[in-house]
């Protein structure tokens, strides 16, 4: 995931193509004329696209977009998308996990079922299953529910997405 500074740098590069007077601020008029040119003179589409941008990115509603406003919008939306995708992927992770390890099909893993996760070459970075059970078992009832698993998988995915990967 890009840092806020990297997002700002990318936005600056992108926005310069729309900033007709190169003052570091985009007006709705500059955006419209830039889009009109990029859309081969289609004024309807350029107007529609300008309206969408103005209504979503112009945080303080002054009719102008600073590079900072655009970068903040991009960073905020990137974070939301990561969280949404992590939530959806975690749900799939939970279903696969329960299908494999929930022997009594009660949508919870008791300690015996949970121990199966650590057997048979299952790839896990954790060696202390009691410690992991304590982390995941949020309500401390000795079982791991589907909701607890989903929260854990979601957190792992968000943590992973937040680290550099090169």
From Swiss-Prot:
Ca(2+) 2 binds at residues 102, 104, 106, 108, 113. Pfam families: EF-hand_7. The keyword Repeat applies. Residues 6-41, 57-80, 89-124, 130-159 form the EF-hand domain. The keyword Metal-binding applies. GO terms for molecular function: actin binding; calcium ion binding. Ca(2+) 3 binds at residues 137, 139, 141, 143, 148. GO terms for biological process: locomotion. GO terms for cellular component: cell cortex; cytoskeleton; cytosol. InterPro entries: EF-hand-dom_pair, EF_Hand_1_Ca_BS, EF_hand_dom. It is found in: Cytoplasm, Cytoskeleton. Plays a role during cell aggregation and slug migration. Interacts with the actin cytoskeleton. This is Calcium-binding protein C. It comes from Dictyostelium discoideum. The lineage of its organism: Eukaryota, Amoebozoa, Evosea, Eumycetozoa, Dictyostelia. The gene is cbpC.
């Amino acid at each position: 995931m890009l840092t806020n500074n990297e997002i700002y740098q990318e936005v600056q590069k992108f926005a310069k193509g729309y900033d007709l007077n190169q003052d570091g601020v985009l007006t709705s008029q500059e955006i419209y004329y830039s889009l009109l040119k990029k859309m081969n003179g289609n004024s309807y589409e350029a107007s529609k696209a300008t309206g969408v941008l103005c209504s979503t990115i112009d945080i303080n509603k002054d009719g102008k977009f600073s590079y900072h406003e655009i970068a903040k919008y991009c960073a905020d939306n990137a974070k939301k998308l990561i969280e949404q995708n992590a939530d959806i992927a975690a749900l799939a992770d939970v279903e696969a996990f329960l299908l494999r390890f929930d022997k009594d099909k009660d949508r919870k893993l008791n300690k015996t079922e949970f121990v199966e996760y650590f057997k048979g070459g299952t790839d896990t970075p954790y060696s202390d299953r009691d410690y992991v059970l304590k982390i995941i078992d949020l309500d401390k009832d000795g079982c791991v529910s589907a909701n607890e698993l989903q929260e854990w998988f979601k957190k792992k995915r968000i943590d992973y997405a937040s680290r550099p990967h090169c």
